């Protein structure tokens, strides 16, 4: 059972309100449900901020799990297929990796040129090989941020 399915089980057990199919009308037809879900998410993010400020390991773990729980819950209640959407985003994120050293070199060159022209702020792009995946990752050294390959595939959502 996936985490999304566990949260679905919880929501079904407690008979929480939900919509049958996600569409833009839900914002007008179910504002109370949306506001409740959003307030739960905000509450859990605030708890995470407090836990991090206090360097509280237990409360950090709790808050992170609770954030996932309330986000999955909102997806379910809005009629969004959480596991499906997560897989779509995951596949897009994995396309940030480069399939060859040549692609990694070209990606670094792209970011270097973009920094010089001022169109992007990544000042120290570099790549490293991920032997476990036989892929290359491009990162910005000064921030540690993973950068997108020149062949990155963004998510294409439909309504």
Model-identified regions with their sequence ranges:
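Flexible "arm" and connector segments at domain edges
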Residues: 1-64, 68-159
